[in-house]
Amino acid sequence: MKSKKSKSTNNTIALNKKARHDYILQDKIEAGIELQGWEVKSIRSGKVNLSDSYVTLHKGEAFLVGSTIQPLNQASSHVVCEPLRQRKLLLNKRELDKLIGSVERQGYSILATAMYWKKNWVKVEIYLGKGKHEHDKRDAVKDRDWARDKERMMKHKV
């Protein structure tokens, strides 16, 4: 019998942690991403940065903007590597229509929060979100501190 390969539990490539702090995230959508060969090699080695990345809509298509994929040192010399290029996201028509409607009518932003492996494909987790005001951010910090203090008090009581 063949033994099965052990699957790694962590398929995450990159995270955008600042998005949760700066935006109220609501609807999650999983999107495929169109990549070039050198980009896949760089992603496998973990040279990806998603901070300050967002999604723009142009002519009925979605593009990931602001993400950085650094080329490897041994990349081919005949291929021009653009670390900051726009990358097309692969979405269904229904998902695109939902995104277009939310952005145009309701003033939402589309943010990339994570990049991960799903089988052999690179997927991007995108969210519809509204920007937080400064007082919303302070309230979130206050709530988080209170929850931590409450846990600490309950732990010492028992």
Curated annotation (Swiss-Prot):
GO biological process, one term: trans-translation
Keywords per UniProt: Cytoplasm, RNA-binding
Subcellular location: Cytoplasm
One GO CC term, this protein: cytosol
GO MF annotations in UniProt: RNA binding
Predominant location: cytoplasm
Assigned protein family: Belongs to the SmpB family.
Task of the protein: Required for rescue of stalled ribosomes mediated by trans-translation. Binds to transfer-messenger RNA (tmRNA), required for stable association of tmRNA with ribosomes. tmRNA and SmpB together mimic tRNA shape, replacing the anticodon stem-loop with SmpB. tmRNA is encoded by the ssrA gene; the 2 termini fold to resemble tRNA(Ala) and it encodes a 'tag peptide', a short internal open reading frame. During trans-translation Ala-aminoacylated tmRNA acts like a tRNA, entering the A-site of stalled ribosomes, displacing the stalled mRNA.
Descriptive protein name: SsrA-binding protein
Organism: Pseudoalteromonas atlantica (strain T6c / ATCC BAA-1087)
Gene name as annotated: smpB
